[in-house]
């Protein structure tokens, strides 16, 4: 299939990130402002139905020949029709279905049977007190149990850790060893200059350089070539363990990003950090209009991440 939607840098959309809901059962400090924490406990957001999501995904797949769908949130496991949705996506013929989750209520075996191939699990601390300070919830053990369940279900598992100076940078090597012992690839994420952190993220910013310095003080490490469109750069230890760093600020991957975002209202965004929604719910039976709006979304892509309020 010839993709009619390509920009001057050769970028196109091959991965669809679907934000199933804005709600979450955690209130992590890099995601939720302290003034909003109490609101997250009883917040229930209306989302698209499974039928609507599948109709949109089928239309986008027809135009873009998508390779991957990644289900995100908020927390995607809060979406009540998650398993039927995954089953429906599998039936569209899209090659890979992935998910990013905190794994606190993970139905791993049924998700695997429905068609989920891999899961990135957010884990920002091993020590319970640090985990609570970040997430404002006592759910560390549920996440650790979720990691075990995902591995038992033979899902491909990765761990995502947002590293924050003065908050959980003292957890970095503990998390590294936890992942290494289980042969799970861990990716350390730089804090992003987004949302309420736009004007003051430097206070807790812990750079790729600092992450590499911390790990290389304990292991001999070698950088690997970055795959095209990959979010992370990877290194290996001298005994063959592979880990990654997502350098959202130091070295963003915008120049060959192939991701399209779909939110829970039926809007698309060409840049994951963009604040300007483009609705496609009103034109799902009009392929030419879909293409025009996808071209508009592609024009939102930056050549370098610059933050977003």
Question: PLM ranges: what are they?
Answer:
Residues 50-71, 75-189:
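Radical SAM/AdoMet-radical enzyme domain recognition
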Residues 195-308:
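Accessory C-terminal segments flanking Radical SAM cores
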Residues 38-43, 107, 127-134, 195-199, ...:
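A short acidic, helix-capping loop that chelates divalent metal ions and anchors anionic groups
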Residues 2-8:
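A detector for short, charged/polar N-terminal pre-domain segments
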Residues 8-50, 64:
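Canonical Radical SAM [4Fe-4S] cluster-binding loop centered on the CxxxCxxC motif
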Residues 20, 71, 266:
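Conserved, mostly hydrophobic/aromatic
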Residues 26, 128-129, 252, 278:
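Glycine-centered loop/turn positions within well-structured domains
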Residues 8, 45-48, 74, 135, ...:
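Pocket-edge positions in alpha/beta enzyme catalytic cores
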């Amino acid at each position: 299939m010839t993709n009619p939607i390509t920009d001057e840098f050769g970028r196109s959309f091959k991965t669809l990130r679907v934000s199933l809901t804005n709600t979450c059962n955690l209130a992590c400090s890099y995601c939720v402002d302290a003034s909003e924490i109490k609101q997250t406990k009883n917040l229930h957001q209306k989302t698209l139905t499974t039928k609507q999501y599948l109709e949109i995904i089928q239309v986008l797949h027809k135009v873009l020949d998508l390779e991957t769908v990644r289900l995100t949130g908020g927390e995607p496991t809060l979406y009540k029709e998650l398993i039927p949705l995954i089953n429906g996506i599998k039936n569209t013929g899209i090659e890979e279905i992935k998910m990013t989750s905190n794994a606190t209520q993970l139905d791993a075996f049924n998700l695997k049977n429905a068609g989920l191939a891999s899961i990135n699990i957010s884990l920002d601390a091993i020590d319970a007190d640090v985990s609570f300070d970040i997430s404002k919830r006592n759910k560390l053990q549920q996440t650790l149990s979720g990691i075990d369940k995902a591995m038992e279900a033979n899902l491909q598992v990765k761990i995502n850790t947002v590293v924050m100076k003065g908050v959980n940078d003292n957890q970095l090597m503990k998390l590294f060893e936890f992942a290494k012992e289980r042969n799970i690839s861990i990716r350390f994420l730089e804090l992003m200059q987004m949302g309420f952190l736009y004007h003051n993220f430097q206070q807790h910013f812990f750079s790729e350089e600092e992450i590499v310095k911390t790990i290389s003080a304990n292991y001999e490490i070698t950088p690997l070539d970055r795959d095209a469109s990959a979010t992370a750069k990877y290194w290996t230890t001298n005994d063959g363990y592979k880990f990654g760093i997502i350098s959202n600020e130091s070295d963003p991957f915008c120049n060959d990003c192939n991701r399209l975002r779909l939110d829970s209202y039926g809007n698309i965004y060409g840049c994951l950090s963009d604040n300007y929604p483009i609705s496609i719910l009103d034109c799902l039976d009009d392929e030419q209009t879909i293409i025009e709006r996808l071209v508009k979304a592609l024009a939102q892509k930056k050549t370098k991440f610059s933050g977003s309020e």
